[in-house]
């Protein structure tokens, strides 16, 4: 039987219910990977005019449809529109280093700058959405990542120590900005986006990037504002965050997230995430990106098949995918073998139904 995309499958995952069949999910997939899979050139069209953007999203949505996703992952990030941005990448300080910088920063213009770029892209996405599918994502970047881009990671620590009131005001303003943009987003695109999310990397391989106390004091109160807004609009919320963040997981779950994505085997096996949190939230991912990059293609589908069946049996709401994303450096054959592993799991489950 031909595969039928059905966004309701992903709603089951976000409700932490076992879906009728295994879904696949990715946070981000490089359009350069999509070009190789589809044998079409379109990645650069996203920055063009209306006709170019329409063609980009036609191909973009076709990729998700043909790769058997049930939702189309898409976001427009906040940091790309911030004047003076780039500190999050390292090597430079952000535009806000003191109270005077905070006061003169053009906060009242940021929402306008965001929508000048984002609106056309969201509209083109919606116009090209395949039947049976809905979008997943929305306004990209979380509270901590925006603070890193505005100040710089190291300088955030100095600011917190030297002027904690300034730190608190910075995070309040970031929260205000996110609420302002998300409010407009939900007014315009709630019908098209069935699941909302943002990504905010709070950790690395051995711990959180800043102390759990700092995260609880400055970051999570602003999370709550956005999550409450999303949930108030009747949308489930998916949180993406990399790193060893076990110290704050219970705090984030208490805010009302419905599911979490991102894992790395060097930090903890995915089975551990299921054991700790699978009774409370949906969990997405499970396939370490290193596996896709390092293993031979013939080995990947077999390993994905074995792991995916195990994760699906142990978790309630589960969607298979990479533990992070599919950047341009992932071998396209490795990615396709992961999708093949998911297809084989579905096929095996259908066979089991017929036998039983």
Residue ranges and their predicted role:
Residues 1-53, 59, 70-74, 93-94, ...:
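Active-site loop segments of alpha/beta catalytic cores
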Residues 32, 80-86, 330:
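Detector for C-terminal structural segments
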Residues 56-84:
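Glycine-rich, N-terminal phosphate-binding loop and its surrounding beta-alpha-beta segment
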Residues 87-88, 92:
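N-terminal hydrophobic/helix-forming segments and targeting peptides
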């Amino acid at each position: 039987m031909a595969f039928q995309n059905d966004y309701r499958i992903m709603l089951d995952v976000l409700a932490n219910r076992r879906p009728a069949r295994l879904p696949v999910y990715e946070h981000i997939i490089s359009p350069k990977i999509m070009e190789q899979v589809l044998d079409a050139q379109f990645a650069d069209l996203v920055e063009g005019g209306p006709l170019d953007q329409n063609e980009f999203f036609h191909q973009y949505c076709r990729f998700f449809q043909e790769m058997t996703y049930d939702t189309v992952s898409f976001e427009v990030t906040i940091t790309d529109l911030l004047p003076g941005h780039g500190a999050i990448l390292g090597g430079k300080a952000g535009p806000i280093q003191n109270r005077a910088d905070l006061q003169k920063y053009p906060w009242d213009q940021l929402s306008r700058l965001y929508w000048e770029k984002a609106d056309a892209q969201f509209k083109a996405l919606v116009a090209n959405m395949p039947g049976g599918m809905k979008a997943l994502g929305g306004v990209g970047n979380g509270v901590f990542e925006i603070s890193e881009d505005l100040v710089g990671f190291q300088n955030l620590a100095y600011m917190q120590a030297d002027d904690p009131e300034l730190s608190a005001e910075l995070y309040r303003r970031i929260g205000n900005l996110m609420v302002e943009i998300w409010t407009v987003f939900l007014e315009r695109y709630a019908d098209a986006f069935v699941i909302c999310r943002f990504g905010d990397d709070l950790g690395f391989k051995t711990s959180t990037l800043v102390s759990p106390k700092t995260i609880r004091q400055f970051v999570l109160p602003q999370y709550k504002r956005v999550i409450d807004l999303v949930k108030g609009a009747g949308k489930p919320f998916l949180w993406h965050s990399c790193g060893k963040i076990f110290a704050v997981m219970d705090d984030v779950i208490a805010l009302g997230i419905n599911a979490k994505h991102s894992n790395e085997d060097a930090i903890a096996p995915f089975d551990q995430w299921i054991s700790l949190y699978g009774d409370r939230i949906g969990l997405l991912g499970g396939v370490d990106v290193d596996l896709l990059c390092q293993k031979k293609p013939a080995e990947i589908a077999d390993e994905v098949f074995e792991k995916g069946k195990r994760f699906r049996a142990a978790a309630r709401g589960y969607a298979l995918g990479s533990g992070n994303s599919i950047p341009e450096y992932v071998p396209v054959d490795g990615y396709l073998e992961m999708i093949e592993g998911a297809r084989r799991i579905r096929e095996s489950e259908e066979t089991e139904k017929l036998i039983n």
